Amino acid sequence: MTKIDSKIPEGPVAEKWTNYKAHQKLVNPANKRRLDIIVVGTGLAGASAAASLGEMGFRVFNFCIQDSPRRAHSIAAQGGINAAKNYQNDGDSVYRLFYDTVKGGDYRAREANVYRLAEVSNSIIDQCVAQGVPFAREYGGLLDNRSFGGAQVSRTFYARGQTGQQLLLGAYSALSRQVNVGTVKLYTRYEMQDVVLVDGRARGIIAKNLVTGKLERFAAHAVVIATGGYGNAYFLSTNAMTCNCTAAVSCYRKGAWMANPAMVQIHPTCIPVHGDKQSKLTLMSESLRNDGRIWVPKKKEDAIKLQKGEIKGSDIPEEDRDYYLERRYPAFGNLVPRDVASRAAKERCDAGFGVNNTGLAVFLDFSEAISRLGIDIVLQRYGNLFDMYEEITDVNPGELAKEIAGVKYYNPMMIYPAIHYTMGGIWVDYELMTSIKGLFAIGECNFSDHGANRLGASALMQGLADGYFVLPYTIQNYLADQITVPRFSTDLPEFAAAEKAIQEKINWMMNIKGKKSVDSIHKELGHVMWEYVGMGRTAEGLKTGIAKLKEIRKTFEKDLFIPGDKEGMNVELDKAIRLYDFIIMGELVAYDALNRNESCGGHFREEYQTEEGEAKRDDENYFYVACWEYQGSDEKEPVLLKEPLVYEAIKVQTRNYKS
């Protein structure tokens, strides 16, 4: 079996990153100008990486699927970004953030990578403040913090409910400066279709101009993928509709391993599904769980009345409400990690206590917070989120609904779990390089930092850590040996072959000429993924799901209809290319979930749970990173490789959020 070298430095975990930086290879300024780097993606990870590499003097080509980097999905992040500043003097530290992240990930993350993430977190806040990011501040002017799930300290920095937007504007300003200087060339409305390998190394990409429809070749000494996750394989998710995994899957087909694809995060606080016409779901920030309390009725008859629309949540008095997270997990209450909160909501709804007409919703209530703090303070913290919820549902969570026996009850939100984030992704080593030399993956599209479950407010932290403070060091260790390599010509046969393969795939899709639209097949895919590869998984269900996924792939291959022409702009063609890769990724998620006969974090196999319904890990047999290797054809099952996990600073134990 292939032995996997993750290139983790020697020494204590707290010294690994410092020692690495002290001994890594460097590229001098004159040589940096001769080296080209392609960065695919302009979200927080991609924009920060492109800006940093350009500022260092490299020649950078940055690709953006949207009209502007400001439309990257990072802009949708609401609640905040974690850092171990300990401004609240509540016991936080780099080690505490490291420990909480490993524990939150159910001990399935690589220890050394997580410690580095916690270590550089403080620098991220300093960098963003210097860029002018308007983080919330206390009355005295100091940066404010709030709490997120899986932590007992307040370490989350935020800008109301638009933290991702403000951080992205900061990264975009840094990127724009380098575009103006000339070190970065920005390509908007381009989508990567394949990575080009020359002598086994990543030397460029084939990208589709989404305006003209033409395929174009781009060469570089190294390629960085920063294209996000694969949550849209489930069709309904909190991801933007353009989010896709085509770049990642193209790397997988060329030999990059896909790691832990079964680790998919389901966010507990999303607006429930309303009918079968929706194209996406809306997230309600985890920050709401700071002051919001999650509950269902204690009495099933009350739940039935709610489902029939005979009563409202505000009609149920305090003594008849079950604040089930506070009851089950007294130490963390409503701030348990996302996988725990999501499964608890599903369990209550499956037991018949759901509160809407589908029975698939629970309440998130702010009555106690408004009574304790006053409506003005609550609106200062969450007003924009309340407005968004009202815009979508026509219910104002800050509006007094009823007063019973002197107790004021406000309109509660209805929430239910939904697909949100993918902890799995392209395998990378400590240097963020994939199993293909010269190909790097950063941000959500890699697997490296979150194990089986990501803590809230840590996605923004990882994206900016990778782009600002990790990749600029590690990529030099690779490029230092490339300084004598001249710039590549896109006339090389490897580029021609890659472009030809993509063009043939496009021709094939356009010539299927079936009857089913891209969206209809995507909906079928999403239904199968949610039903069989969603929150509750079983061996039997996963086998059924794999069979159905293969049927969906056959339907695509025989009955897909794409209107229009392959020349020029064709949005349906672009969606079809992405959909086929979602199907391949969906199969990979199911294979990994079926192979992993344990429950951990976001991967919950119903056969493997405790008597209390908690995840039951199997550290003896599954204490590894699952790396899936492509076998040359979409028809062949991938081969599993294993990277054993090694923990030196943390004792592996069963997660406990009850005490």
Where are these regions (language model features)?
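Glycine- and aromatic-enriched mobile tails/lids
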Residues: 15, 19, 24-27, 31-36, ...
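Core beta-strand elements of the Rossmann-like FAD/NAD(P) dinucleotide-binding domain
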Residues: 33-35, 213-222, 435
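Glycine-rich Rossmann-fold phosphate-binding loop(s) that bind the pyrophosphate
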Residues: 41-43
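Conserved redox-cofactor binding core of oxidoreductases
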Residues: 124-214, 226, 270-284
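Glycine-rich loop(s) and the adjacent beta-strand/alpha-helix scaffold that form part
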Residues: 222-281, 450-473
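An anion/pyrophosphate-binding glycine-rich loop and adjacent beta-alpha core
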Residues: 250, 257-402, 473-476
